């Protein structure tokens, strides 16, 4: 039998970077086309976020340079605020680091892995460092960054400083990657940037393809989106660990002040109510009869906390004990006490979390984006009111629907999360499932797969429930699924009205032509019978037909508007 010391001889602590180096597929680096798109996605996402947070209309330039077989250089440049020199290694070389991952705020990236994952992918496929050129308005810093995977740290292997007489601000990164391919498929870089332009009409995006062709997606809006607002966590959406860790970091001097100050929808009155619920739960757990215990839990869930308390002798003593808990320093809160607080939250009723921090694209901008890129004959957009899922996480759904014009036949679903295109893993995504659940024939789209229809769905949240770390598919959460369906049906009804009018107009044009076809013969016959000039009779009937059909069109439009 092997000794324990021998079994643990190869024991090694693995860093976050080392883990993701060995499991790059978890970050979306699977397949040659997808891997290249993922690299571009991470860089472009960083650029857009940086520009918007600084209140700058984004200008993003992407260049794909072919260096050899399945060997490319990816260059992404923006006009953002730039990166301070001391943060370069953190931004590009440290996993799970960033300005957004630790905040309860809507953002394109949520995990702090993105661009550093792209740097690592370039490093493990080409062996080359990533070249970063950036300036915040002062000197231009040029640095070559690599990741020390054992330490999960970035390191600058070479750095140069250049004068900046024109005051340039922005960031340019160059990543050399191998084992990837550039193709113009619906999972490639071109399609990704096209979809990004639709959801970000305020951004000017350029792409230089490997053959040197320049493609421009011009901005169609001059308005920078308002930055999202950080939101306090809602009691219904937190875990014991959240409360415990937050308590250790807070500057509040009592648990009561901590709960009121760090969470949404908690007031002094709510803390007093929380005290009763914690006391009631402590007392219920002392009840030995399980049937009675279950009844008490049910009554507590129904809000009968005072009646539950009064059913126990000496309950006031327990209430006083819990009240003391609320006056202790938060850093002294034990795990068990944090657990009691979270358990009580589950039985209490709270107002829905505030949703002012969510920033939708907006109906007008969705329509601008779809019109500017797709050139349809009909377009509409729906932004649903904010809702919550899992009891306390705010989210919002918006939908854009485009039809006809320059759109080719065949249904296209454009999926987004916080404005970011989702190109992969569509089958399991809630957006796909919701879109496929619609009976499109009810809305005069008889053959969806052949119809020139583009449906855009954007899910907005401080915590988008992705199905994996690759962030390409949204989990099928009931509340989100239902909101998507409602938004699609609203947009589809508008399309139905348009198509009904279009079909009616085509029918009327056909009828009008039929009547006009017989006018010459009728005019000739009536001219013989009445002695009136044939041309006058003919013009009379043509005017009559024109006026009659014009009146019919006005009446039909009034009916449609009032429907």
UniProtKB/Swiss-Prot annotation:
Q: Which domain of life is it from?
A: Archaea
Q: Choose any GO biological process term that the UniProt entry carries and state it.
A: DNA topological change
Q: List the disulfide bonds.
A: none
Keyword Transferase listed: no
Q: Which UniProt keywords apply?
A: ATP-binding, DNA-binding, Isomerase, Nucleotide-binding, Topoisomerase
* Presence of keyword Nucleotide-binding: yes
* EC number(s) given by UniProt: 5.6.2.2
EC top class, as a word = isomerase
Q: In UniProt terms, what function does this protein have? A: Relaxes both positive and negative superturns and exhibits a strong decatenase activity.
Q: NCBIfam families given for it?
A: PRK04184.1, top6b
On subunit structure and binding partners, the annotation says: Homodimer. Heterotetramer of two Top6A and two Top6B chains.
The text of the family note is: Belongs to the TOP6B family.
Name this protein carries in UniProt: Type 2 DNA topoisomerase 6 subunit B
């Amino acid at each position: 039998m092997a000794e324990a010391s021998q079994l643990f001889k190869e024991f090694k602590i693995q860093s976050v970077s080392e883990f993701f180096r060995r499991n790059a597929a978890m970050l979306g680096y699977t397949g040659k086309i997808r891997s290249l798109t993922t690299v571009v996605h991470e860089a472009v996402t960083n650029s857009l976020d940086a520009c918007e947070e600084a209140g700058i209309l984004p200008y993003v330039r992407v260049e794909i340079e072919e260096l050899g077989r399945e060997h490319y250089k990816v260059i992404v440049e923006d006009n953002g605020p730039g990166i301070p020199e001391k943060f370069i290694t953190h931004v590009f070389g440290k996993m799970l680091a960033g300005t957004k991952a630790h905040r309860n705020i809507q953002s394109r990236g949520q995990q702090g892995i993105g661009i550093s994952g792209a740097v690592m992918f370039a490093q493990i496929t080409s062996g080359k460092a990533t070249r970063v050129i950036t300036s915040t308005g002062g000197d231009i810093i040029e640095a070559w960054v690599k990741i020390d995977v054992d330490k999960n740290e970035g390191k600058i292997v070479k750095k140069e400083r250049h004068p900046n007489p024109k005051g340039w601000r922005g960031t340019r990164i160059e990543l050399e990657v191998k084992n990837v391919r550039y193709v113009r498929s619906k999972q490639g870089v071109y399609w990704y940037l096209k979809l990004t332009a639709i959801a970000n009409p305020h951004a000017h995006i350029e792409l230089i393809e490997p053959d040197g062709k320049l493609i421009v997606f011009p901005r169609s809006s001059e308005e920078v989106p308002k930055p999202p607002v950080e939101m306090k966590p809602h009691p219904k959406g937190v875990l014991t660990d959240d409360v415990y860790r937050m308590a250790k970091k807070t500057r509040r001097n009592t648990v009561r002040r901590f709960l009121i100050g760090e969470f949404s929808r908690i007031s002094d009155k709510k803390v007093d109510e929380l005290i009763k619920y914690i006391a009631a739960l402590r007392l219920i757990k002392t009840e030995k009869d399980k049937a009675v215990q279950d009844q008490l839990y049910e009554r507590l869930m129904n809000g009968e906390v005072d009646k539950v308390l009064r059913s126990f002798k000496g309950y006031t003593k327990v209430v006083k004990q819990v009240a003391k808990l609320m006056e202790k320093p938060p850093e002294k809160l034990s795990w068990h006490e944090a657990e009691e607080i979270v358990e009580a939250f589950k039985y209490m009723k709270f107002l829905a979390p505030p949703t002012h921090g969510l920033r939708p694209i907006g109906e007008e901008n969705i329509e601008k984006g779809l019109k500017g890129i797709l050139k349809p004959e009909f377009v509409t957009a729906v932004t649903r009111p904010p809702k919550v899922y899992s009891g306390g996480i705010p989210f919002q759904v918006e939908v854009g629907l485009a039809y006809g014009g320059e759109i080719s036949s065949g249904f296209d679903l454009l999926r987004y999360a916080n404005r970011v295109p989702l190109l992969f893993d569509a089958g399991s995504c809630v957006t796909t499932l919701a879109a496929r659940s619609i009976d499109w024939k009810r809305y005069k789209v008889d053959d969806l797969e052949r119809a020139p229809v583009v449906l855009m769905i954007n899910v907005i949240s401080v915590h988008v429930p992705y199905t994996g770390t690759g962030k390409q598919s949204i989990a099928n959460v009931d509340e989100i699924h239902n909101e998507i369906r409602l938004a699609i049906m609203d947009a589809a009804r508008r399309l139905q009205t348009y198509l009904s009018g279009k079909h009616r107009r085509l029918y009327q044009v056909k009828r009008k032509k039929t009547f006009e076809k017989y006018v010459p013969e009728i005019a000739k016959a009536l001219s013989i019978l009445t002695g009136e000039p044939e041309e006058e009779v003919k013009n009379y009937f043509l005017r009559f037909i024109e006026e009659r059909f014009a009146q019919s069109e006005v009446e039909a439009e009034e009916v449609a508007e009032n429907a």
